Structure formats: structure tokens, C-alpha cells
Swiss-Prot record:
Protein name in the entry: Phosphonates import ATP-binding protein PhnC 2
UniProtKB keywords: ATP-binding, Cell inner membrane, Cell membrane, Membrane, Nucleotide-binding, Phosphonate transport, Translocase, Transport
Keyword presence, ATP-binding: yes
Binding residues for ATP: 56-63
The gene coding this protein: phnC2
Amino acid sequence: MGAEWLPVRKLGMVRGISPDSNLIRIDGISVRRGHRTVLHDVTASFPTAKVTAIVGPSGVGKTTMLGLLNGLIAPASGTVSFSEIGLLTEPTALRAARHQTATIFQDHALIGRLSAIDNVLLGLADTRHPLSPLPWPVAARQRAAKALDDVGLLDLATRRTAQLSGGERQRVGVARALIRRPKLLLGDEPFASVDPALAQQLGGLFRSLAMREGLTVILVLHQLQLARAIADRIIGLSDGRVAFDGPAAAFDADLEARIFPSLALSHDHSPPLSQPKETICSID
């Protein structure tokens, strides 16, 4: 049976959703690349106003799952349902959904000669336009200023990004995503290039934004300690299968060592688990 993109209600209204609701749910998803199956029968849900971390070793399908959620990768089988945002095969609907999704990458690709606020405004630009300051309307500049204020950088709005620290540039990247007023915020290893203290600070920013703005935040992380510290929920992938799905507080060092022996900070010498045929641990 092929993949099914489920019809949804009209786009929008996320800020009226209960914090306990799930914005996104995937059921029985499999993704293949050539003859290799990258994700095997994955089922997971992603709640509104919460931060979900997707963790696991390299090559287990974390980034593939992110590509699935932003509509860039089509599954071979399974269903994808969005409470308020739908990814459909019809191009117009897909574009509408992408307008409500923002992705933050490790390489935030700012333009050093532009100010922080001009870099943020580029989040609104049509990619066909030149990457240079445009005569933005007042309303757009107000939105950019608010986005910078949300990440604590309003005082540096006119400073060129080449003059900012690494952490400040990362915040500009977050603000550029926020100016689009997304309902879904995705991050692919967004803290890989910053030190642990700054990563925790930025992680706290994501949690605050999720709660205050009603965002569904999904982060791919390889730092397991950081995932426990900043996420509300953790999904652990092993060989393309869900090995853990539950509250971050339940993902303790012992469980981490059992599921991810190669990544675990614990030096437990118990034998590693075999490839999971099903979810090892799911805690609601």
C-alpha cells in the first residue's frame, strides 16, 4: 500500500489548539532510498507547544524523518496526518503547508555584510530576489524587530552579522525562521557548532518559544544529555526504527546505554541490544 497524505482542516489556527494536542502524527511510515529502507514502519506523534528531540547514532534516519515532516521526502508507505497543516501531493496545498513550516540548520547561512535585521527580513523574501537589502515596508520591519526581540537581539538589530558572535548569529538564524510566523519549527542539528553552555541557552529559547507561541518544535540532536535537558519528549531511532518514544525525563542513562551503547555516556558493559523489531520503550 502506498503512502497516504491525509486531508486536513483548513490551515492555520494553531495558537487556538490545546497544548495537549498533537499537531503531527505519522503512522506506519517507511522510507526507501534505492534498495535500502531508511525508516521502517515508524509511528510517532508530535505535540503542540512542546519540544520533541529525535536522537540516535548517525545514519539511523533522523534527518530523513525531518525531511518527511517538512514535505521534502515522500514515504513509500504509511500515513501522515497534520492537525492543522497538511502535506498533500497537490502542489498548491504543499506550498501552503511549507509557508507554515520553518527549518533551522547547523549552517545558518547569514550574509555577513548585511545587518541582523536585514538578514531576518530575508526570511520573507522570494528566493528569486537578489540577496541584498530591499525597500521593505514598515510592517515587515516591525515583524523583523519583534523576531529579534523574541531571541534577545533587538539591541543588535543594525549591527552587521559578520561582527556578531557565533551564538548571536545562531539567534539571528532563529529570528529569520520566526519572522515567517511558522506553526512548525524544525531544527537539523541546530546546536552542533556551539559550545554546551550556549546550546543549553538556545535550547531554553526553543522551549520558551514553543510554550509562548504554541509552536510544535522538532529538533534532530546527537547530544543526548542536551536532548534530556531541553526536550519535553524524546524519540530515539535505531536502525531506522523507533527504539524509544516518551517523556525526556524517562530517558535515563541506563536506558540510553541499552538503546544506544555507542553513544551512551554511561560505561555500562552489558551486551548491546540487537536491532529492534519494535519500540523498546514507549511511555505516555
